A protein has these predicted regions:
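Membrane-interfacial helix-loop segments of redox and metal-homeostasis proteins
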Residues: 1-213
Length: 213
């Protein structure tokens, strides 16, 4: 990652403005029960996309979690970077706390399952699970932070993080429409090819932009 540089205010405000506009669209065209569309917006009526907390709870928790994450610089990638390179444990302790909280919550609600079998919305092909996460991890390392950190920085006005966050939205839409997304029924039709291509692209970007010490 290159050093941060000052840019125009409009550049930094672009992603927060887009996020506010999307929120306003939701308020103007709220989801109609059991209907896949409300005005120009489309909603999931089944599957994981349809499972979410009530709007007020989601917004309130997002506000609280966002404050803590921004102030603590929470980042899963940064946690391991600081631990291995600088022996700095501040971010890693935050990651460990999140893992412990998720573990306890799942144990109390009966959602704790070990292994690949029986996991919600996931297939059991170990190799492509592993390669998919290697590709994702490499992309996050090149970007300088995990997806959550990118969202937090985008909200702070980091235009690079804003582009990354928009890329995640566009990428998710393309994956589901082009047959590369996987599910509990198995690997997507073109999931393997997309994983290999994505990994190759990340390697090329990394080597092309690498600098000698």
């Amino acid at each position: 990652m290159a050093a941060a540089t000052a840019r125009a205010v409009v550049s930094g405000a672009l992603f927060p403005v887009i996020a506010v506009c999307l929120l306003l669209l939701y308020l103007i065209f709220p989801q109609i029960p059991d209907q896949p569309q409300s005005g120009p917006l489309f909603y999931s009526v089944k599957g994981p996309g349809s499972q979410h907390a009530p709007f007020i709870a989601s917004l309130g928790l997002a506000f609280i979690i966002g404050i803590f994450a921004q102030r603590s610089r929470f980042c899963t990638m940064g946690a391991f970077r600081d631990l291995f390179l600088f022996r700095y444990t501040h971010l890693f302790l935050g990651l460990a706390a999140m893992f412990a909280a998720a573990f306890i919550a799942n144990a109390l609600t009966g959602g704790l399952k070990f292994g690949f079998e029986g996991q919600p919305v996931a297939h059991s092909d170990f190799l492509w699970n592993y390669l998919g996460m290697v590709t994702a991890g490499l992309a996050f390392a090149l970007a300088g932070g995990c997806p959550g950190r990118q969202l937090f920085m985008a909200g702070e006005g980091d235009s690079d993080a804003g582009i990354f966050a928009l890329g995640m939205l566009v990428g998710a839409a393309m994956a589901h429409n082009l047959g590369t997304a996987s599910s509990g029924t198995g690997i997507g039709v073109y999931g393997m090819q997309a994983t290999i291509l994505g990994f190759a692209v990340c390697l090329i970007i990394g080597f092309v932009h690498s600098k000698k010490a």
